[in-house]
C-alpha cells in the first residue's frame, strides 16, 4: 500500500490535514491561479518559475508541481509539464506548462506563475521570507481539524470556510 492510499484509508477513521505547502499565502496563490486558468482557458501560455535555497535537493519543488496540477485541473486540454526546454529547438507548443527551477543562496521560496497572452502578460507570485510561516500554517491546520469529522482536509477547506486565521 502506498503512502497516499494509507492516508485515504486513515481519513475514513480520523480527520487528516494534507497540503504540499502549509503557507496560507501559497495556497491562496494556488486558488488564484486556478481562477486565472479557468478564465483564460487555453489561450495563454503558462510558465512557473520557482526559486529556493542552494541546499534544496528536489527540482521542481512539490509546491511548483502543486501549482501546475491546480492549473491543469482547470484546463479543458490537459497540458504536459516541460522541465527542460533547452534540448528541443522548436516553437513552444500550446499544450504545455513550463516549469523552471532556480537553486541558490538562502531563498526560502519564491513562486511566480506567468500567463503570457497576446499583447499582455499576467503574473501571480508569492515570496516566503521566513520558514516561520510554514509552522504557523501547520498550527492553524491543527486548530482547523480539531473536532472535525473523519475525512481528508486541505488548505482549500480552510480558505473556503474563512477559518484560515482562526
Language-model segments: residues:
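Rossmann-fold dehydrogenase core element
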Residues: 6-23, 41-46
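Short, small-residue-biased leader/transition segments that mark boundaries at the very start
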Residues: 1-3
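Short, hinge-like loop/turn segments at secondary-structure boundaries
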Residues: 8-14, 33-37, 64-67
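Small/polar loops that bind or transfer phosphate-bearing groups
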Residues: 20, 28, 126
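Rossmann-like NAD(P)H-binding beta-loop-alpha module
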Residues: 28-40, 59
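C-terminal substrate-binding/catalytic lobe of Rossmann-fold NAD(P)-dependent oxidoreductases
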Residues: 42-166
Amino acid at each position: 500500500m502506498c503512502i497516499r492510499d494509507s492516508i485515504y484509508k486513515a481519513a475514513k477513521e480520523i480527520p487528516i490535514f494534507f497540503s504540499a505547502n502549509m503557507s496560507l499565502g501559497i495556497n491562496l496563490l494556488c486558488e488564484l491561479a486556478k481562477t486565472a486558468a479557468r478564465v483564460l482557458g487555453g489561450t495563454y501560455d503558462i510558465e512557473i518559475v520557482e526559486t529556493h535555497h542552494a541546499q534544496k535537493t528536489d527540482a521542481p519543488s512539490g509546491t511548483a508541481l502543486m501549482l501546475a496540477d491546480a492549473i491543469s485541473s482547470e484546463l479543458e486540454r490537459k497540458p504536459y509539464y516541460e522541465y527542460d526546454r533547452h534540448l528541443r529547438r522548436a516553437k513552444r507548443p500550446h499544450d504545455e506548462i513550463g516549469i523552471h527551477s532556480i537553486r541558490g543562496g538562502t531563498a526560502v521560496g519564491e513562486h511566480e506563475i506567468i500567463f503570457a497572452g497576446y499583447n499582455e502578460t499576467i503574473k501571480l507570485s508569492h515570496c516566503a521570507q521566513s520558514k516561520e510561516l510554514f509552522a504557523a500554517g501547520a498550527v492553524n491546520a491543527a486548530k482547523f481539524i480539531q473536532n472535525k469529522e473523519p475525512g481528508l482536509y486541505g488548505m482549500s477547506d480552510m480558505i473556503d470556510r474563512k477559518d484560515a486565521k482562526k
